[in-house]
C-alpha cells in the first residue's frame, strides 16, 4: 500500500501532495480505516492557504460572512464523526533484527478518493495539450484540479448542501478564477514570473507557471490581448458551422436559433456568408437571401401573397433562404397568424429543397410557439439550435484599472449556481383573466396569498441561512409551480363562480358561438390557450333560445383534451341524455362531457366519478340520473335519500340501516353502479363529513368501521339549494303538480265544428301576478299551546346559508358540478303542444285544425316532465288507435276542429303511470 501511495503522490504537485498527506494523517488520528474525499475536503477547508474557503465565500449568493465557512467546517466534522472506525492494529518489526517501536497502520485510500485522483489527472491532461504526449507520471495534478475533483464527489456535495453551499457553484468560482489568472498573466508586460497578487480574484498562490499555461484554455489562444476574443470567435465559428450543416440536410433543415442574447448576430454572419457566395461548392450554391422587414413580418397573415411572389422571383435556378427574424410575431397575435403558419407550410412544400427558413427566438418565445402551434415544428421542418449566451470576460469580471495598472480583474461576487440555471427561467405561464364576482374574487386572492406565503417562506426560520438545513436550489421549479397553482386557482374560482353565481357577470362570460361536433374536428381558428396548464374547464352548452351561464362552454375544454377526447362516447351520451331530459340540454351536455373526460383519465386518478346536480329541477335531475345509468351500466340507478323526505328508499329504513350503510352496501354489491345521493344539503353533519372523506380518499366507511373501495361507481349528489341569483322564471309547485297528474285522469279527442269551440284558460299552476312574498295571515289562538318545534325566519335563513356554504365546498371537491336551470314550464308546454299538433297533422288532412285544452296541455306536460317515458314514446303508444278513429269519422271537406280535452269523469287508470294509456274519441 505504501508503494501505491508513493506512486500517487508522484502525480501531484507539492501542495496537492501535502494536502493528501494531511488528509491521511487526519484519518489516522480519527482511527478510520480509509481516507475518503471527506477527509481531503475537511483538510482543504482548514488549510492555511484558505483557497477552498475563499471559493466558498465567493460562490455564496447571499452573504459572505466568515461564520458560514465555520458552519461548513462543523458539517464536515460531523460527517467525519459518522464514519466507521476500526480497531487499532499495530505491526511490529522483528524484535531480533530491529528495535523500532510499533507504529499504527496507515489507512487505505478509499475507492472514491482514488477515483477523484484519477479524475483530476485526466482533467489535467485534457486541459493542457502540451502534456497529453507526456508519460502518465509526468503529469502533475495541481491543487485546483484536486479541489474540483473532490467537489465532484457525491458525499462532499451532500455535506456542502447541508451547510447551504453548492458544489457546482464553488467549482464555477474556481474555474472562473483560473481563467482570470490566465488572462491577467497574459496581460502583464514584463517578466512572466512577476505577478501582482491583487490582480487575482482570490486564493492566488505564487507558483511559477509559463504564460501559456492554463487548464481550460488552449495555449495557442492565450496570446496577449486577444486570447478571449479569439476563443469567442472560434466558438461562434463552430456554431455557424453547425447551422450550415443543418441547412444542407434533407430533413429538419430549417434552423431556429434559440437564445437570450446573441442569436441574431450569428444569423447575420451566416446570411452574409451565403450572400457572398462562400458556399459555392455545396448545397447552398446559388442561394439568395430574403430578409423580411419588421413591418412585413407583423402583417404576414395579410401579405402572404406578396411573400410568395417575392420567393418565386428570386428562387431562379438556385434557392432562397427566407429570414423570418424573431419569431415573437407568431405569439403576439396567435389567432391572426394561425393561417399564416399553414400557408408557410404550403410554401415550403411547393419549393421543397430550394427554400429554407431561418429565424431566432428566445426560450420563452419558442416554448410559446410550441404551445400555440403544436405541429409547426414538423410542418416547417424546424430544428431548434440552442445558442449559449456569450459575454466578454471584461463584462463578467470588470477591471478596476487600465492594463498599465496593477489592478486587473476581480471575480464577481454574484456567481450563480449551475443547479439554479434553468432553460425556462424566463418563461412565464400566461395568466387568464378573472371573470368572477367580487365574493369569489376575494376568495381567489386569499388562496393566492396562501400559495405565495408557502412558496416564499414567510414563516422561514429566524436562524441565519448558513445555520439552516440546506434546501435544493430550485427557484425556477418553484416559480413554475407557483404559476401552475395560480392558473389552477383561476380555473377553480372562475368555474365555481360560473355555477354558483351565474348572473353576476354572465354578460362577460357568455361565448357567442355554439357547440358543434363538426367544429370540434374541423375548426382551427380557435385561439389556443396561453398554457397547457391554464385551460379553463367551464361546462355547459350554449343554446339559441336560452341564456344559461353554461353558454361559456366547451371550446376551451376540447382544446385541452385534444386527441384523448372520445367524440363517439360524448355524442352517444349527449344524444341519450338530451333525449330523456330535453328541457335541460345544457346540463345534458355538461354531464356527457364530464363523464367522458373522467373516463379517459383527465379527471381524478381514482376510478370513481363524483358529480353534483344543483338547482331546483328535482324531476330533471332524477331523469338525468336514470338516463345516465341506463347508458353507462344498462340498469336503473340506486337512489338513497339523505333528507327528511325519504321517498324512494323507505323500505330500507325498516331494516335499521343508516344511509351511510346503504351507500356502502350498494357500492359493495355493484362497483360499477350509478348511485344517487339525494338532498345532500339536508343530510346531517356526520354524513356530510363521511361523504367529503369518501370524495378525497376514494373509499367509504360504514357505521361499523368497514371500508369499501368505491371502485368505478358514479356517485351523483343532488342539492336543492338555490345557488346564486336565479332567473326570473315563474316558480312551479312541484308537489301540487305531482299530486294533480298522479290522480286518475283521461283524455278524449272531440271532433266538432269550428263554431262550437270553446277555450278555457286556468292558471292554477303559476302565481305570476304575485312576484313578492305573500303576507302571512297572523291569527293567535290563546287557547292553544305554543309549538316548541317552530323555528323563526332567522333560523331558516341561517340554515339556508349553511346549505349554500356546504354546496359551495362540495363543488370544489367533486369532479364536476352541473347546474340545472329553473324549469321554464311554458317552453315544456309549447314543445308538448307542437309535438301533439305535428303528430295529428301527419295523419290527418291539411284542412283540419287541432286545438288543445289548457288543462289537458298542462297535465300532459306535467306528466311528461315527471314520468320516465318520453313524449314521442307516449304519442306512439296512445295516439295510434285514436288517429285511425278520427280518420274514419272526419271528412277533409268539413270545417272541423279536433280538440284534445280532459274527460269530465276522472277514473283511475289501469296503466298506473302519470299518462293515460289510451285516448277516447268523441264526435260532437
Swiss-Prot record:
Domain Clp R per the UniProt entry, residue ranges: 8-181
Any coiled-coil regions, as ranges: none
Residue ranges with Low complexity bias: 86-105
Gene3D superfamilies for the chain: Clp, N-terminal domain, P-loop containing nucleotide triphosphate hydrolases
Disulfide bonds: none
Tissue specificity of this protein: Expressed in seedlings and leaves. Detected in roots and axillary branches.
Annotated region (Disordered), positions in chain: 86-107, 522-552
Keyword Repeat: yes
UniProt name for this protein: Protein SMAX1-LIKE 2
Gene name of the record: SMXL2
Amino acid at each position: 500500500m505504501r508503494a501505491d501511495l508513493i506512486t500517487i503522490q508522484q502525480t501531484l504537485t507539492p501542495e496537492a501532495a501535502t494536502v493528501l498527506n494531511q488528509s491521511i494523517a487526519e484519518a489516522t488520528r480519527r482511527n478510520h480505516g480509509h481516507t475518503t474525499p471527506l477527509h481531503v475536503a475537511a483538510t482543504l477547508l482548514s488549510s492555511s492557504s484558505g483557497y477552498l474557503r475563499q471559493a466558498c465565500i465567493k460562490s455564496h449568493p447571499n452573504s459572505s460572512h466568515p461564520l458560514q465557512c465555520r458552519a461548513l467546517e462543523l458539517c464536515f466534522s460531523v460527517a467525519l464523526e459518522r464514519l466507521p472506525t476500526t480497531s487499532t492494529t499495530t505491526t511490529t518489526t522483528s524484535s531480533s533484527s530491529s528495535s523500532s517501536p510499533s507504529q499504527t497502520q496507515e489507512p487505505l485510500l478509499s475507492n472514491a478518493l482514488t477515483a477523484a485522483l484519477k479524475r483530476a489527472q485526466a482533467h489535467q491532461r485534457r486541459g493542457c495539450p502540451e502534456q497529453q504526449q507526456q508519460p502518465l507520471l509526468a503529469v502533475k495534478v495541481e491543487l485546483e484540479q484536486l479541489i474540483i475533483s473532490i467537489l465532484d464527489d457525491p458525499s462532499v456535495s451532500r455535506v456542502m448542501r447541508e451547510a447551504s453551499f453548492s458544489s457546482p457553484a464553488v467549482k464555477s468560482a474556481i474555474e472562473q478564477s483560473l481563467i482570470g489568472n490566465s488572462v491577467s498573466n497574459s496581460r502583464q508586460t514584463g517578466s512572466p514570473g512577476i505577478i501582482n497578487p491583487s490582480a487575482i480574484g482570490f486564493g492566488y498562490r505564487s507558483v511559477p507557471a509559463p504564460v501559456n499555461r492554463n487548464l481550460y484554455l488552449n495555449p495557442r489562444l492565450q496570446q496577449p490581448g486577444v486570447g478571449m476574443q479569439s476563443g469567442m470567435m472560434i466558438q461562434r465559428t463552430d456554431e455557424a458551422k453547425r447551422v450550415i450543416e443543418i441547412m444542407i440536410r434533407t430533413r429538419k433543415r430549417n434552423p431556429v436559433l434559440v437564445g437570450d442574447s446573441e442569436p441574431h448576430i450569428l444569423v447575420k454572419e451566416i446570411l452574409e456568408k451565403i450572400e457572398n457566395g462562400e458556399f459555392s461548392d455545396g448545397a447552398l450554391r446559388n442561394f439568395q437571401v430574403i430578409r423580411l422587414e419588421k413591418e412585413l413580418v407583423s402583417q404576414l397573415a395579410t401579405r402572404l401573397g406578396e411573400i410568395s411572389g417575392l420567393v418565386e422571383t428570386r428562387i431562379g435556378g438556385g434557392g432562397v433562404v427566407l429570414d423570418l427574424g424573431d419569431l415573437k410575431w407568431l405569439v403576439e397575435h396567435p389567432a391572426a397568424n394561425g393561417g399564416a403558419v399553414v400557408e408557410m407550410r404550403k410554401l415550403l412544400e411547393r419549393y421543397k429543397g430550394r427554400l429554407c427558413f431561418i429565424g431566432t427566438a428566445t426560450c420563452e418565445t419558442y416554448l410559446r410557439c410550441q404551445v400555440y402551434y403544436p405541429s409547426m415544428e414538423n410542418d416547417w421542418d424546424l430544428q431548434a439550435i440552442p445558442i449559449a449566451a456569450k459575454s466578454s470576460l471584461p463584462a463578467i469580471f470588470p477591471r478596476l484599472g487600465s492594463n498599465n495598472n496593477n489592478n486587473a480583474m476581480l471575480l464577481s461576487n454574484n456567481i450563480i449556481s449551475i443547479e439554479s440555471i434553468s432553460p425556462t427561467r424566463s418563461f412565464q405561464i400566461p395568466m387568464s383573466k378573472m371573470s368572477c364576482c367580487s365574493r369569489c374574487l376575494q376568495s381567489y386572492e386569499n388562496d393566492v396569498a396562501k400559495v405565495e406565503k408557502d412558496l416564499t417562506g414567510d414563516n422561514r426560520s429566524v436562524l441565519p441561512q448558513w445555520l439552516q438545513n440546506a434546501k435544493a436550489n430550485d427557484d425556477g421549479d418553484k416559480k413554475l409551480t407557483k404559476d401552475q397553482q395560480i392558473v389552477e386557482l383561476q380555473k377553480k374560482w372562475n368555474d365555481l363562480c360560473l355555477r354558483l353565481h351565474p348572473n353576476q357577470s354572465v354578460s362577460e362570460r357568455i361565448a357567442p358561438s355554439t357547440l358543434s361536433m363538426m367544429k370540434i374536428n374541423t375548426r382551427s381558428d380557435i385561439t389556443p390557450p396561453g398554457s397547457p396548464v391554464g385551460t379553463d374547464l367551464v361546462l355547459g352548452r350554449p343554446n339559441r333560445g336560452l341564456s344559461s351561464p353554461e353558454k361559456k362552454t366547451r371550446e376551451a375544454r376540447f382544446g385541452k383534451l385534444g386527441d384523448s377526447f372520445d367524440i363517439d362516447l360524448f355524442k352517444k351520451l349527449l344524444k341519450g341524455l338530451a333525449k330523456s331530459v330535453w328541457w335541460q340540454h345544457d346540463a345534458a351536455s355538461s354531464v356527457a362531457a364530464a363523464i367522458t373526460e373522467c373516463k379517459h383519465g383527465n379527471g381524478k386518478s381514482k376510478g370513481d366519478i363524483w358529480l353534483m346536480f344543483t338547482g331546483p329541477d328535482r324531476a330533471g335531475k332524477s331523469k338525468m340520473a336514470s338516463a345516465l345509468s341506463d347508458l353507462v351500466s344498462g340498469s336503473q340507478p340506486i337512489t338513497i335519500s339523505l333528507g327528511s323526505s325519504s321517498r324512494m328508499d323507505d323500505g330500507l329504513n325498516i331494516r335499521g340501516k343508516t344511509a351511510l350503510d346503504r351507500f356502502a352496501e350498494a357500492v359493495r354489491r355493484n362497483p360499477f353502479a350509478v348511485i344517487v345521493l339525494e338532498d345532500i344539503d339536508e343530510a346531517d353533519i356526520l354524513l356530510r363529513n363521511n361523504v367529503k372523506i369518501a370524495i378525497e380518499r376514494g373509499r367509504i366507511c360504514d357505521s361499523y368501521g368497514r371500508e369499501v373501495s368505491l371502485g368505478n361507481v358514479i356517485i351523483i349528489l343532488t342539492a336543492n339549494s338555490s345557488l346564486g341569483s336565479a332567473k326570473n322564471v315563474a316558480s312551479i309547485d312541484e308537489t301540487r303538480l305531482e299530486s294533480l297528474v298522479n290522480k286518475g285522469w283521461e283524455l278524449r279527442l272531440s271532433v266538432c265544428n269550428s263554431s262550437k269551440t270553446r277555450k278555457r284558460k286556468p292558471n292554477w299552476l303559476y302565481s305570476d301576478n304575485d312576484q313578492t312574498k305573500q303576507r302571512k295571515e297572523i291569527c293567535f289562538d290563546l287557547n292553544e299551546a305554543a309549538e316548541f318545534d317552530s323555528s323563526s325566519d332567522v333560523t331558516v335563513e341561517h340554515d339556508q346559508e349553511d346549505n349554500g356554504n356546504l354546496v359551495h365546498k362540495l363543488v370544489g371537491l367533486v369532479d364536476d358540478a352541473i347546474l340545472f336551470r329553473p324549469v321554464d314550464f311554458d317552453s315544456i308546454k309549447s314543445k308538448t303542444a307542437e309535438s301533439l299538433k305535428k303528430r295529428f297533422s301527419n295523419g290527418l288532412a291539411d284542412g283540419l285544425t287541432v286545438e288543445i285544452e289548457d288543462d289537458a296541455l298542462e297535465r300532459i306536460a306535467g306528466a311528461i316532465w315527471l314520468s320516465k317515458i318520453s313524449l314521442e314514446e307516449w304519442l306512439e303508444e296512445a295516439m295510434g288507435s285514436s288517429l285511425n278513429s278520427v280518420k274514419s269519422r272526419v271528412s277533409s271537406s268539413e270545417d272541423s276542429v279536433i280538440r284534445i280535452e280532459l274527460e269530465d269523469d276522472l277514473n283511475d287508470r289501469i296503466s298506473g303511470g302519470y299518462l293515460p294509456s289510451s285516448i277516447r274519441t268523441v264526435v260532437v
